[in-house]
């Protein structure tokens, strides 16, 4: 939020809305860290928005000349929503990295491609094939989700008190400074931009849960082994711990994501309660999604596939090979273009996971 307030002042000075001296002073104060973040959050909950106590802190550091130009023509939701988009950029950067690690592990598993497997439909043995088939069905949806991440938009929120942009001079300056999409129409009660981002994350989590569930089943049947956890009661047990962790985190994700995706509509020009609930959800969405991808990635890193005692018809082997070849080529292209999202803080992964 401090970053947004500082960028707002700088952009308004660039556009001639406030004096440059005030903007420089505000921006300098906004580079400071709040001395008590926990107290800020507590006061923000009491005040109804964390922006109010944050502005009190910034005002205490400003000269009388700079005070009138702080938070000029903005409303609290502008600051919170824009800060949330900056946070979501960081979340996507972490998730893209974790997804890339998983895709790389799967791509490396092409070494098992020709191993015979027994396919299963409705969990029952079906037809012999090769691991190329299963590899394709694991990897292709992940690549789809990664491409959806690349197309995601993180819009600026700047609508003023009631979302009519009254008195504001619109320019691209603020959006460009924050590397956000310059959406002209405010979205105070149109939460589709937030829903869209959460649903993209949901695609990754659903993919991870599907693969983790498959790994648990294959570990049970002895068709795959991976890093195992022990048991306090049964020394012979070797539990597929990483896959289990991924399933648990995915279940938790869907619970907190529903706060966004199943929210009641936001009323009129500014919502009462539904918007505030997002503050609880977004950090938990980031934590549970990254935990899911991290866990399934660790499972894939240690995964060994075992050959089934079946004879694969040549035609089925060829069909599976063709599917895998196209998917692996696509994976190598996507991994080759993998790059971090534009953002200032690349250390966020440790804070999220």
Residue ranges and their predicted role:
Residues 1-27:
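His/Asp/Glu-rich acidic catalytic environments and adjacent acidic regulatory segments
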Residues 12-21, 89, 93-94, 118, ...:
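Inter-helical turn/loop segments and adjacent helix faces that build the functional surface
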Residues 19-74:
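Glycine-rich, N-terminal phosphate-binding loop and its surrounding beta-alpha-beta segment
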Residues 20-24, 33, 44-46, 51-53, ...:
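Catalytic-core signal marking the mid-to-C-terminal active-site face
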Residues 39-50, 71, 80, 84-87, ...:
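Non-transmembrane, amphipathic alpha-helical segments
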Residues 49-68, 97-100, 127-266:
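Internal glycine-rich alpha/beta core junctions
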Residues 74-84, 162, 209-210:
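Conserved phosphate/anionic-ligand binding catalytic regions in large, soluble enzymes, centered on
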Residues 79-128, 145, 176-193, 270-273, ...:
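Long, non-coiled-coil amphipathic alpha-helical linker/lever segments
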């Amino acid at each position: 939020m401090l970053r947004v307030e500082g960028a707002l002042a700088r952009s308004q000075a660039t556009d001639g809305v406030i004096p440059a001296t005030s903007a420089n002073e505000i921006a300098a104060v906004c580079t400071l860290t709040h001395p008590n973040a926990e107290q800020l959050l507590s006061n923000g909950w009491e005040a109804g928005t964390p922006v109010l106590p944050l502005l009190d802190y910034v005002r205490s550091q400003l000269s009388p000349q700079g005070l009138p130009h702080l938070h000029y023509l903005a409303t609290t939701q502008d600051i919170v929503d824009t800060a949330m988009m900056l946070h979501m950029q960081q979340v996507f950067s972490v998730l893209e990295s974790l997804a890339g690690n998983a895709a790389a592990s799967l791509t490396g598993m092409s070494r098992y491609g020709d191993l015979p497997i027994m396919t299963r439909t409705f969990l029952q043995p079906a037809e012999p094939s090769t691991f190329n088939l299963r590899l394709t069905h694991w990897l292709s949806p992940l690549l789809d989700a990664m491409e959806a991440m690349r197309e995601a938009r993180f819009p600026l929120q700047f609508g003023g008190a009631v979302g009519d942009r009254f008195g504001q001079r619109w320019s691209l300056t603020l959006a460009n400074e924050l590397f956000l999409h310059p959406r002209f129409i405010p979205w105070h009660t149109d939460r589709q931009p937030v829903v869209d981002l959460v649903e993209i994350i949901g695609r990754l989590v659903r993919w991870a849960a599907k693969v983790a569930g498959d790994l648990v089943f294959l570990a049970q049947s002895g068709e795959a082994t991976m890093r195992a956890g022990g048991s306090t009661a049964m020394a012979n047990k070797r539990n597929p711990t990483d896959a289990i962790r991924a399933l648990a985190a995915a279940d938790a994700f869907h619970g907190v994501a529903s706060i966004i995706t199943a929210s009641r509509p936001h009323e009129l020009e500014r919502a009462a309660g539904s918007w505030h609930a997002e503050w609880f959800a977004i950090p938990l969405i980031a934590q549970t999604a990254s935990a899911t991808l991290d866990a399934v990635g660790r499972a894939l890193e240690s995964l060994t596939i075992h050959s089934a005692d079946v004879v694969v018809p040549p035609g089925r082997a060829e069909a599976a090979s063709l599917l895998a070849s196209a998917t692996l080529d696509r994976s190598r292209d996507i991994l080759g273009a993998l790059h971090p999202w534009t953002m200032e803080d690349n250390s966020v992964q440790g804070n999220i996971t």
